[in-house]
Amino acid sequence: MKINKKTVIALFMIVMFLFTILISIGDVLEVLLRGNKRGTIEEVEETIVVIETTMGNIEVKLNAVSAPETTANFLDYVKSDFYVDTVFHRVIPGFMIQGGGFIATGKPKITEDPIELESNNGLKNLRGTIAMARTSDPNSATSQFFINLVDNEFLDYTSTNEGYAVFGEVVEGMEVMEAIGNVKTATSGLFEDWPEKNVVILGAYLKEN
């Protein structure tokens, strides 16, 4: 049987079309099997993390809907016990308390790769909210977080300000947050606002329902 040029082209187009469909199906299956590297929204939605400190417990409700990557990143550190024996190394009354990156000696802990900034998520740096700390590079947040002691509007995202990504709020332990925020601080090495008596994070874990 003679196969003309048009038939060959038509068959080629059909084969390429089927090949494209197979690749698309393969990509979808890969995503479903692999999952999200930093967790999924279903895993972290409505999650409460207990931050156990030497001054009491702080319970934080995470907002995975508004800040999915930031929340999943935080949970990765929680689940790996990364925060155990870290301290609140920066305490500024009337501003915020910051921790999650250093141990009591001032030695930094080795972190995972930084994440992209999710500050443009509609959440504000209000009193009692938790947000990711970072350097001047917007996409540099790793493990360090801070809790706002007051409404800090200047930390919010605007068209001219990258801001800081809020990903949850304190639901229990506001008095502990306030107590930590009122401890005496001093300069310790490179740190200007280090508590005179270390406020240690004994553990951070998921609250059981």
Predicted regions and their residues:
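Cyclophilin-like peptidyl-prolyl cis-trans isomerases
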Residues: 1-209
